[in-house]
Amino acid sequence: MGDFILFTHTKWSEAPRIRHQVANLLLEAGHRVFFFERPSPFWQSPAPAVEQARPGLTLVRTRNLFHHQLRALVPMHWLNAAFVESQIRRRLTVCDACADATIINFAHDYYFLRRLFAKSRIITIIHDDFEAQSRLPFASHIAWSLEHTCRMSSEVFAVSTPLQERLRVWCDPKLLLPWSVVPYRAPVPDMARRKLLVYWGFVDSAIDLNVVCRISDHLHEKRPDWRILLVGPTQGSGRQAVLDGVAGRANIEVRGRTELDELPLDEIIAALAPYRSSPACDSVTLANKSMQLFARGLPLLISNMPSYIQQPFIVRLDGTGGVGAAVDAVAANFLAWQSQIERFVADNAPATRLRLLGVEPAASAAGAVVGRL
């Protein structure tokens, strides 16, 4: 059993993302995880500072001086780094992490970690295009953080090919794509019931309503007994815009947060990813939720996302034939694609990502993790 210290800009209670998935992957492999959550503003006192969330998982909370998107000047980076570094040092004194713990860093601005862990293996995972997300009219302050963080790391991973290419100017990053947290499950082969297209994600302004409405129009004309289901929670205030955008369309239903297995999987013909073009979407190579959908045997219909991985069962809604050709493709090939989907899920099992990260399962968990292959 080994110890892993994870640094993130995420609360453990948030919707699961790659930070949570890596933590769970390590826990299931029999290791201990110390999960440093997103720092609170300096005027707040996070409580408890250290919390045993469950066996093997310790949540650790710190504070910072400035939000990572707002450090416009290098001295602001220095001041914040000194403050956060002191916070981390104090928290480590009350944690029982081993001195040789492996560090997995998801914070693009924690370039100071080498001062804290001089001899440790530090793995940095860049999971977003932070420069594109800059809240200021320039991104040089973010590039400064990224460069220094990459250069101090033992290894760097990127979650998409565009991010991987961006980071090459400072390091030799490897590609870390999402993996399937559950094994492939063959869908019921009753095609007569499959008349439902499902979007399962955040229902907000990231959805391209023009694409959704084109699908709705096509179904109304060509497949009047088919429906669209938009399922998920909302970040911010974008839900009302979605509701307004699909109002009056009888073949579209919007639901709140629902677990995937609570949906009528035997009625779903394909999953939807109808996203708007944006810097964040343009850099996506494989979305986290996609692997969960593939594990249930569902093909995927996507729009925009030019860097998305190419597979026969990932069909573009903005391709040559438009939404009609995409819908026809999943209707004609759903069963024929299952062997390819099953193989893709197996090739992206948890054990493959452990090996990529250079992590061995603890002896007590080795059989369970290897068995997932």
Model-assigned labels for residue ranges:
Residues 162, 177-181:
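Carbohydrate-associated surface elements
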Residues 189-207, 212-218, 229-231:
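Conserved donor-binding/catalytic core segment of Leloir-type glycosyltransferases
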Residues 13-17, 207, 262-266, 273-294, ...:
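Nucleotide-sugar-dependent
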Residues 178, 332-371:
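A charged, aromatic-enriched C-terminal amphipathic alpha-helix characteristic of glycosyltransferases
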Residues 22, 86-94, 129, 136-156:
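Membrane-proximal helix-turn-helix segments that form the acceptor-binding/catalytic region
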Residues 232, 239-262, 269:
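Nucleotide-activated donor-binding/catalytic signature segment of Leloir-type glycosyltransferases, i.e.
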Residues 12, 111, 126-138:
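A short, histidine- and acid-enriched strand-loop-helix "catalytic/donor-clamping" loop
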